[in-house]
């Protein structure tokens, strides 16, 4: 890859060629691009310059580890492209110092643009429990899940929404009709709130700092999904709980219906519900007891989710946070997976990640250290399966042979193996999160496998 000065030099050379050309854009040039040059108007650029801008943005990103977390590739390229406009329009293209001038001004513009990425809060409707009564906000790091009427009250209190708009939204949620607003912007914002929350009884909000809009939004969505997965860890079968915990932007209630024909028979299409519209129902005061019991889990997972949305990743325990972040993400994907064989692969990825990718022996060491099982201990009360055999089955047949395309069991029923994987993975993840909270000064992932 060419150096920074070489790339900027090639851009300046192309601009000089464009100025000297009599027929730009010619028949073979296509429609030229424009770069905003601020007070100096805009610059006409060709495909070669666009390619050089892409190369320049990749080089700048490669040399800036913080930017790789803060920006999506598209956002970073757009920012680099925009930063080039004013200096390129202001220099003398024949000045031997032009390259250095552009380089310095681009870096200065990038720093200024990044400093403007302040605090943002992203929100989306979600399902959780069947009733919102007596449910206090659930806080897991930067994520807050609250009943939509609580969220609306908070938006008014924090002056993020006007009282008139909030009153109209409550009326709409109660089934009332709304007259059109005179102010077009207020009308659009009101419609946005109603669309984004939808019929969901809860709202999931995520606060970010130092992230640009699109990257911040994507990280907020990821953190939201992970927070729901953490909440599902409180149930014996997390995937069933998570089926009723869902962001509105994800798939909604689904009724699976298939029409089947058999020779000589009249058959009717059966149906099965998935992506349920809500989760569990709690009696009055019951969730408060559960929330108190889950507070240590939410505190530990909160540190991990803070790492997910952190602008630079420079936190006190980056190594352990990174391992646990990936484990929670794999766990979420495993619970959501519709195909049993693929779910097994993802559940085992949770175990393998917690074991730092060191395979079957270290997964056994992890379960011994955190769960307390010896190799020959039975994992079920019935005594039908030893821990070492369970791990061998999951890692060998369930994970490795499937990933490498050598499994001869994909056409068989994997529901039992999925059940086994869903027994071990959440248990290991829970115990690792507990250890993470209890050992607040530790940042060596290998210690997860030490008693």
Mark where each language-model region is:
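Histidine-centered, metal-coordinating catalytic motifs and their short helical/loop contexts
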Residues: 384-415
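Composition- and surface-driven signal marking solvent-exposed, interaction-prone regions
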Residues: 346-347, 361-368, 412-421, 445
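Charged/polar positions within long, soluble alpha-helices
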Residues: 359, 400-407, 429-438
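Short, mixed-charge aromatic SLiMs
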Residues: 369-382, 451
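Amphipathic alpha-helical interface elements
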Residues: 1-61, 65, 70-78, 93-123, ...
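S-adenosyl-L-methionine
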Residues: 371, 377-378, 394-398, 433
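Charged, non-catalytic interaction/linker regions at domain boundaries
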Residues: 73-342, 416-451
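Short glycine/proline-rich turn/loop motifs
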Residues: 310, 329, 377-380, 405
């Amino acid at each position: 890859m060419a150096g920074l000065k070489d790339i900027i030099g090639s851009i300046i050379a192309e601009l000089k060629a464009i100025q000297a050309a009599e027929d730009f854009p010619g028949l073979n040039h296509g429609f030229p691009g424009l770069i905003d040059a601020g007070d100096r108007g805009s610059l006409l650029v060709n495909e070669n310059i666009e390619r050089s801008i892409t190369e320049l943005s990749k080089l700048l990103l490669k040399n800036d580890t913080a930017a790789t977390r803060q920006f999506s590739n598209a956002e970073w390229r757009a920012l680099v492209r925009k930063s080039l406009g004013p200096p390129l329009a202001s220099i003398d293209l024949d000045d031997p110092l032009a390259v250095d001038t552009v380089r310095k001004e681009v870096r200065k513009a990038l720093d200024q643009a990044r400093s403007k990425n302040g605090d943002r809060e992203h929100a989306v409707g979600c399902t959780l429990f069947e009733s919102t009564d007596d449910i206090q906000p659930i806080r897991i790091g930067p994520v807050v899940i609250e009943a939509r009427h609580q969220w609306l009250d908070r938006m008014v209190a924090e002056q993020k929404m006007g009282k008139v708009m909030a009153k109209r939204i409550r009326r709409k949620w109660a089934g009332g009709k709304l007259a059109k607003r005179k102010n077009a912007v207020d009308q659009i914002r009101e419609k946005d709130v109603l669309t984004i929350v939808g019929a969901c009884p809860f709202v999931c909000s995520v606060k970010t700092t130092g992230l640009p809009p699109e990257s911040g939004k994507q990280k907020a969505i990821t953190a939201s999904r992970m927070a729901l997965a953490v909440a599902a860890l409180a149930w014996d079968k997390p995937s069933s709980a998570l089926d009723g915990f869902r962001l509105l932007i994800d798939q909604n209630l689904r009724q699976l219906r298939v029409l089947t024909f058999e020779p000589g028979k009249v058959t009717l299409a059966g149906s099965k519900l998935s992506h349920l519209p809500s989760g569990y129902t709690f009696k009055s005061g019951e969730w408060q007891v559960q929330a108190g019991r889950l507070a240590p889990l939410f505190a530990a997972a909160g540190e991990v989710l803070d790492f997910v949305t952190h602008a630079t990743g420079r936190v006190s325990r980056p190594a352990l946070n990174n391992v646990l972040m990936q484990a929670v993400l794999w766990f979420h994907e495993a619970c959501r997976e519709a195909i049993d064989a693929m779910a097994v692969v993802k559940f085992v990825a949770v175990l393998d990640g917690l074991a730092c990718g060191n395979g079957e022996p270290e997964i056994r060491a992890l379960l011994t250290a955190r769960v307390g099982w010896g190799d020959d201990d039975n994992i079920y009360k019935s005594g039908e399966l030893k821990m070492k055999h369970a791990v061998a089955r999951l890692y060998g047949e369930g994970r490795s042979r499937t990933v490498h395309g050598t499994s001869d069991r994909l056409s068989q029923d994997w529901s039992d193996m999925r059940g086994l994987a869903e027994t071990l993975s959440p248990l290991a993840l829970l115990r690792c999160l507990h250890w993470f909270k209890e050992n607040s000064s530790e940042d060596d992932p290998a210690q997860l496998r030490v008693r």
